[in-house]
Regions:
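Multi-pass membrane catalytic core of lipid/isoprenoid biosynthesis enzymes
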Residues: 78-85, 101-152, 226-266, 270, ...
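Small-residue-rich segments of transmembrane alpha-helices in multi-pass membrane proteins
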Residues: 55-64, 114, 175-189, 235, ...
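Membrane-embedded alpha-helical segments that form the functional core of polytopic membrane enzymes
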Residues: 58-99, 109, 133-141, 148-160, ...
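Extended hydrophobic alpha-helices typical of membrane-associated regions
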Residues: 37-40, 253, 257-318
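Intramembrane alpha-helical segments
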Residues: 43-44, 113-196, 200, 257, ...
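Structural signal for the C-terminal ends of transmembrane alpha-helices
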Residues: 65-70, 163-164, 189, 316-318
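Cytosolic, membrane-interface loops and tails of multi-pass inner-membrane proteins
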Residues: 16-40, 93-120, 214-237, 284-293
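Membrane-interface helix starts
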Residues: 47-57
Length: 318
C-alpha cells in the first residue's frame, strides 16, 4: 500500500541582505539609562563617593602588615588585604543601611541614602551584601588556616555592629574592634601567631576608632536622641571633648608601646608626633560642637593614620 505523500514544509524565504532588525534605539537608550541609574544607586549604597571608611580601615591593616613583615610585606598578601578592605567596607555599608532603613529617613544627614529614600529595595541590598560576602569569603580562603579563623570572626563583627547601637551606648568601641581586626589577621597570616604587639596595636585602633566615631556621632546627636539611637556622643554629654582627648592620648601611648615592642626608632616617633598635631587640630575643630566642624574632624583622622604609616615605613627604609 502506497503511503500518502505529505506536502513538503514551506521553504523559509531568503533573508533580504538589506534587512535590518528594528531594535528601537530609544528603548535601548532608556534601558541603558535605567541601568546606569541603578548602578549609581548601588555605588552610593556602598559609599564609593566617600572613601574615608576605606582609609580608616586600610591604615591599621598597613601598620600591621609592615610590622609583621619587617617592612617587606608579601605582595600577594598585600593585594588580598587591599581587596578585602574594599569589599568588607562596602559590605559593612550595605548591612548598616539595611539595619537602619527605618531610622535613616528620620535623620537629616542620612534621609537621602538609597535605602532610606526607597530608591534601592531591601531585597536588592541583601543580594548585594551576599555577593560581597561571597567575595570576602573567597579572599579569606587564600589565607593560612589561623588567619581564616580570624577572618571569620571579623566577618561576624562587621555583621553584628549595626544592631548594637540600638541597645548599648558604646558601639564606637565595638566598631574599633571591627576596624582593627585586620591587625591580628595580618600577624596570623605572616608569622603564624598573634603576638603581644598585635594586641597593643589593636588597643590603639579601638581607642582611635572610638575617638573618630564619637566625632561622627556628634554630628547626629540631636537626631539620634530623637529617634532612640545610642552612641558615646550621647553618653559622654558635655564631657565629650575631654574624654575624646583622654582617648587620643591613650591611643598615642599604645602606639608608642607598640613601637618599643617592634624596636622602631626616630622616624616612627616623628610620625606619632605628627599624628598628635592632627589630634590637636581635631580638638580645635570640635571646640563648639558644630556638626559640620565635627564631621571635618572625623574626616581629618585619615591624615592621622597616614602620617603614622609614613613614619613606620620610613623607619624600616632608613
Amino acid at each position: 500500500m502506497n503511503a500518502e505523500l505529505l506536502p513538503a514544509p514551506p521553504r523559509k524565504p531568503r533573508r533580504d541582505p538589506k534587512y535590518k532588525p528594528d531594535f528601537k534605539p530609544h528603548n535601548l537608550r532608556d534601558a541603558a539609562l535605567a541601568l546606569g541609574r541603578t548602578l549609581c544607586e548601588y555605588a552610593l549604597l556602598i559609599r564609593l563617593h566617600r572613601p574615608i571608611g576605606i582609609w580608616l580601615l586600610m591604615w591599621p591593616a598597613m601598620w600591621a602588615l609592615w610590622i609583621a613583615g619587617q617592612g617587606r610585606p608579601d605582595q600577594k598578601l598585600l593585594l588580598i588585604y587591599l581587596a578585602g578592605i574594599f569589599v568588607m567596607r562596602s559590605a559593612g555599608c550595605v548591612i548598616n543601611d539595611y539595619a537602619d532603613r527605618d531610622f535613616d529617613p528620620r535623620v537629616e544627614r542620612t534621609r537621602d541614602r538609597p535605602l532610606a529614600a526607597r530608591r534601592v529595595a531591601s531585597g536588592e541590598a541583601i543580594a548585594i551584601f551576599i555577593v560581597l560576602g561571597l567575595i570576602a569569603t573567597w579572599l579569606a580562603m587564600q589565607l593560612d588556616p589561623l588567619a581564616r579563623l580570624y577572618a571569620a570572626a571579623g566577618g561576624l563583627l562587621a555583621v553584628t555592629y549595626p544592631w548594637l547601637k540600638r541597645y548599648v551606648y558604646l558601639p564606637q568601641f565595638y566598631l574599633g574592634v571591627a576596624f582593627g581586626w585586620s591587625i591580628p589577621m595580618a600577624f596570623a597570616a605572616i608569622t603564624g601567631e598573634v603576638p603581644r604587639i598585635a594586641w597593643l596595636l589593636l588597643a590603639a585602633v579601638v581607642l582611635w576608632a572610638a575617638v573618630y566615631d564619637t566625632m561622627y556621632a556628634m554630628v547626629d546627636r540631636r537626631d539620634d536622641l530623637r529617634v532612640g539611637i545610642k552612641s558615646t556622643a550621647i553618653l559622654f554629654g558635655d564631657a565629650d571633648r575631654v574624654i575624646i582627648g583622654v582617648m587620643q592620648v591613650m591611643a598615642l601611648l599604645a602606639l608608642w608601646l607598640a613601637g618599643d615592642e617592634a624596636e622602631l626608632g626616630l622616624w616612627y616617633r616623628s610620625g606619632l608626633a605628627a599624628g598628635a598635631m592632627f589630634f590637636v587640630y581635631q580638638q580645635w575643630l570640635i571646640r563648639d560642637r558644630e556638626p559640620d566642624a565635627c564631621f571635618r574632624a572625623f574626616n581629618n583622622n585619615h591624615y592621622f593614620g597616614l602620617v603614622v604609616f609614613v613614619g613606620l615605613a620610613l623607619d624600616y627604609l632608613y
